[in-house]
């Protein structure tokens, strides 16, 4: 359009229909929430193992004995209960004597 007044000559209509575009998507999405649940369950099935240092006394000579174990927190609690009970640790010097 040129000028201040609109005339019919200035209006151009393009009456061709637009190209049809298929908006349907035929892909099937995998439900990712199932994978996330499996990962969380997988972590729960194998608890995290850590290193724990145990310092105790030899039952033969009362010298300090240091152990480093790798286990879960639940397992280290069981070791603690055993050490408080009847389990005794023997140092390498006293081991051949018993």
Curated annotation (Swiss-Prot):
Keyword list, A-Z: Activator, DNA-binding, Early protein, G1/S host cell cycle checkpoint dysregulation by virus, Host cytoplasm, Host nucleus, Host-virus interaction, Inhibition of host innate immune response by virus, Inhibition of host interferon signaling pathway by virus, Interferon antiviral system evasion, Metal-binding, Modulation of host cell cycle by virus, Oncogene, Transcription, Transcription regulation, Viral immunoevasion, Zinc, Zinc-finger
Lineage: superkingdom: Viruses
ZnF region ranges: unnamed: 58-94
Subcellular location: Host cytoplasm; Host nucleus
Motif, Nuclear export signal: chain positions: 76-84
Protein's UniProt keywords contain Repressor: no
Record-linked Gene3D superfamilies: 3.30.160.330
GO biological process, one term: DNA-templated transcription
Post-translational modification: Highly phosphorylated.
Record note on domains: The E7 terminal domain is an intrinsically disordered domain, whose flexibility and conformational transitions confer target adaptability to the oncoprotein. It allows adaptation to a variety of protein targets and exposes the PEST degradation sequence that regulates its turnover in the cell.
Function text: Plays a role in viral genome replication by driving entry of quiescent cells into the cell cycle. Stimulation of progression from G1 to S phase allows the virus to efficiently use the cellular DNA replicating machinery to achieve viral genome replication. E7 protein has both transforming and trans-activating activities. Induces the disassembly of the E2F1 transcription factor from RB1, with subsequent transcriptional activation of E2F1-regulated S-phase genes. Interferes with host histone deacetylation mediated by HDAC1 and HDAC2, leading to transcription activation.
Protein name from the UniProt record: Protein E7
């Amino acid at each position: 359009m040129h000028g201040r007044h609109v005339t019919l000559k200035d209006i151009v209509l393009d009456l061709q229909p637009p190209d049809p575009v298929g908006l349907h998507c035929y892909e099937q999405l995998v439900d990712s929430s199932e994978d996330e649940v499996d990962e969380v369950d997988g972590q729960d099935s194998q608890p995290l193992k850590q290193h724990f240092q145990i310092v105790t006394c030899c039952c033969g000579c009362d010298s300090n004995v240091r152990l480093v174990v790798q286990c879960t927190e639940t397992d280290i609690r069981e070791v603690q209960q055993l050490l408080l009970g009847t389990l005794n640790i023997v140092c390498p010097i006293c081991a051949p004597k018993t």
